[in-house]
Amino acid sequence: MNKDSTWPIELGTSGVLAPGRWLRLRSILWATFLSACAMAFFLSTQYLGAWLHLPPRSSYFIVLGIPLLAFIGYGVLISAAEGRKPVEVLPHTGMIAEISVGALLGFFMLCAVTALLWTLGLYHVQPNHWQHIFDSFVFNSYLSGMMEELMFRAILLRILGRAFGLRWGLVLSAGLFGIAHLSHGSWLAAVEITINAGLTMGLVYMATGRLWMSIGLHTAWISPKIPCWASTITTVCSKACRSPANPTYLPGGKFGPDASVLATFIGALAVAAIVY
């Protein structure tokens, strides 16, 4: 077991990640291969139904099932190539509790960000209608929470941490997480997401050594934003709309409150709470 002296995270020290010559190169190639596999699983959630000419309702089974298959596939590859138990993705007795704690953390973080923006007059809240909540959860929150945590935390953070040290693994994986969200907003939004989500979720994974709490945080961070506040998509219960008179970098633009410059304050508090 190779666990950092401070963080209970299994980095891997055998097989393809064994000490010795070309460790960094081997680590980068291994991370690239696993990331490509994870991306293949993700793309299959988007296109498998059309490729196989399946009925439209099959998309629910595809999106719910393929992330589970991705986790199983990851576990098989880790066992074979690294010669260890993939503890970061294995179910355990405290799994539900970890998911719940992560979900509460994500929910309250987004509540705090939205409340701050509302207090400063950058958002206004109005009633909305319940609709499409299950679809929003399955096709956005659940899918993103499972697949992005697998790729950016279990694969990139862990393996880059093995190659360059855990701090660099955290920073690099968080930066790549922000870059991956560039298509959703501006470069400034990507920087905010790097801090507010990338660092926070990475630290949660490092603090537990397992993905479940970070998956709960990730899922809850997305879930209420879409179905409850509808900061990017109008769907459910109450609607938080940014005031158009304010600069887009303050309320977060089209990506929503988690891309706000002011959300960095909440993200920094969360990071400090986890670290200290």
What are the roles of these predicted feature ranges?
Residues 61, 65-73, 134-139, 147, ...:
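Membrane-embedded alpha-helical segments of multi-pass membrane proteins
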